[in-house]
């Protein structure tokens, strides 16, 4: 995809649909503890299809993928409104219409015919003797290696505090930490070194946008984990995100419903009340007039909204404004010292010669 897909005025005129969900953060996804990815967990280390993973590609997942992160990296390429494009727009979109695994050979060829890329794959992978050997699995694992290195983060002030530096957190941040692990109940789900239990919970996050509808869904909605498991008890549940560098990953919620940490914290304290007080302006969507009429159509479906309200896994809690502010302050203490100074950064040029978005 070229620069013309950037969010300029020309592109806005081309927008036909919103992306259903907020992009997940990349921080620490190379950690072995991550075994399930995507908001609905549709990718996981498993052996359902004799290829090591339970994924949207099912038995058509390419051979040679070794990590869950490398496997995840090849799926945005197949998403129509992320990278694949619209029907009849290009050969990738056309191939996707036939079957998902028809996309990857096309993309792998585009990469390996660029001499510099081909040479780098030969140098990096033991089983690649020439550029012709490069497959989408090599590309996925190369992307995973980059993400694992570039977005590793374990040097936050909170890490220093745990290691014994009592001055690493301010008094208010320490107060927030005490609330996080105590009265506020945050650590019930945001636990462990990565601050996630990797499980799925229903929070009644305000719905909007196109949803992630299944073929038989008669209306716009996003049922979360249930879309993967078909289990009614998983309705509207979404994966607990890691809170590492959370202050850098706004907006919050699986669909980006809240633009601030305070907003998403207050929602956790009173899910139904926050749902009822939420306004469309909080979504902070790019202004696209011809989509705005349907962006919030799900709110007109009282049956769907009632189902959403009935499925909440957490209990309301009461915190005063000072306690909420302390929690927000503590969230900032989870930002790594080096999080804004990544090891590799954005290159000046890339082998394809395409413009680099700075």
Regions found by a protein language model. Give the residues of each.
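The canonical Cys-X-X-Cys-His
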Residues: 4-5, 26, 69, 143, ...
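Single conserved hydrophobic/aromatic residue that forms the stacking wall/gate
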Residues: 1-7, 11
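An acidic, gly/pro-interrupted, aromatic-rich
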Residues: 43-71, 202-293
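Post-cleavage N-terminal segment of exported redox proteins
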Residues: 80, 95-174, 178, 191-199, ...
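Active-site-proximal structural scaffolding
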Residues: 19, 62, 136, 169, ...
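Extracellular low-complexity, Gly/Ser/Thr-rich intrinsically disordered linkers
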Residues: 245, 251-271, 275-348
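Detector for the c-type heme attachment site
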Residues: 31, 189-195, 248
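Periplasmic c-type cytochrome electron-transfer domains
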Residues: 13-125, 129-148, 247, 254-263, ...
């Amino acid at each position: 995809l070229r620069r013309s897909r950037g969010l300029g005025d020309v592109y806005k005129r081309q927008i036909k649909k919103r992306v259903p969900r907020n992009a997940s953060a990349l921080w620490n996804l190379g950690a072995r503890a991550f075994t399930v990815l995507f908001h609905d967990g549709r990718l996981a280390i498993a052996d359902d299809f004799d290829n090591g993973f339970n994924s949207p590609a099912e038995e058509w997942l390419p051979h040679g993928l070794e990590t869950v992160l490398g496997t995840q990296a090849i799926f945005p390429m197949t998403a129509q409104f992320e990278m694949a494009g619209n029907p009849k727009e290009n050969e990738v979109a056309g191939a996707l219409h036939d079957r998902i695994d028809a996309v990857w050979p096309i993309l792998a060829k585009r990469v390996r015919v660029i001499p510099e890329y081909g040479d780098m794959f030969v140098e990096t992978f033991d089983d690649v003797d020439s550029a012709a050997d490069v497959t989408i699995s090599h590309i996925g694992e190369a992307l995973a290696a980059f993400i694992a290195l570039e977005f590793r983060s374990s040097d936050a002030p909170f890490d220093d505090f745990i290691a014994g530096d009592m001055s690493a957190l301010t008094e208010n941040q320490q107060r927030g930490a005490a609330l996080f692990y105590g009265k506020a109940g945050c650590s019930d789900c945001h636990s462990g070194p990565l601050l996630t239990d990797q499980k799925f919970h229903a929070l009644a996050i305000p719905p909007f946008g196109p949803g992630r509808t299944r073929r038989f869904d008669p209306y716009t909605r996003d049922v979360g984990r249930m879309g993967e498991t078909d289990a009614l008890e998983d309705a509207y549940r979404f994966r607990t995100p890691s809170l590492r560098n959370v202050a850098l990953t706004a907006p919050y919620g699986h669909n980006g419903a809240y633009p601030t940490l305070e907003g998403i914290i207050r929602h956790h304290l009173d899910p139904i009340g926050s749902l009822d007080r939420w306004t469309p302006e909080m979504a902070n969507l790019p202004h696209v007039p011809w989509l705005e009429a349907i962006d919030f159509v799900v709110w007109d479906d009282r049956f769907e909204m009632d189902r959403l309200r009935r499925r909440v896994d957490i209990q309301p809690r009461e915190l005063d404004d000072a306690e909420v502010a302390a929690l927000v302050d503590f969230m900032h203490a989870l930002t790594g010292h080096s999080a804004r100074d990544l090891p590799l950064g954005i290159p000046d040029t890339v082998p394809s010669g395409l413009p680099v978005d700075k």
